[in-house]
Amino acid sequence: ASDVWSVTSFNELSRDGQHVERWNHLHPDDKPRKAYVTQMLEERKGPVVSSTDYIKLHSEQLRAFIPKTFMTLGTDGFGRSDTRQKLRSFFEVDRYYVTVTALAALARDGDIAEEVVLEAMRKYGIDRNKPNPVLS
């Protein structure tokens, strides 16, 4: 099973986390506060995968506040595709890469066998030796 969450603003979640960190630094004698995104995810099972049509760094700004294995996917470039579907495929953020990334995170955490990831890659035709789209 999995949960799908929609983030309306990575920036606002990041600001909240930074505000909480500042408050905790300035109030060492009080009970530490937790960022909103931390509160929402800390009791959830499994890794967190972020997939966005923006650059990876957009969601990476939440890494400090995600209390789980956190994998980010993003379109680190532009002008490479004539449709959104092709863009997502080229930059490895389409549904197949989201699935394989989630499975890879589960394998990394020891929750599933690595063979499950390899089988999904075969099923979806993912070439793991394809050049990194950011560098191509």
Where are the regions a protein language model picked out?
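Thiamine diphosphate
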Residues: A1-S136
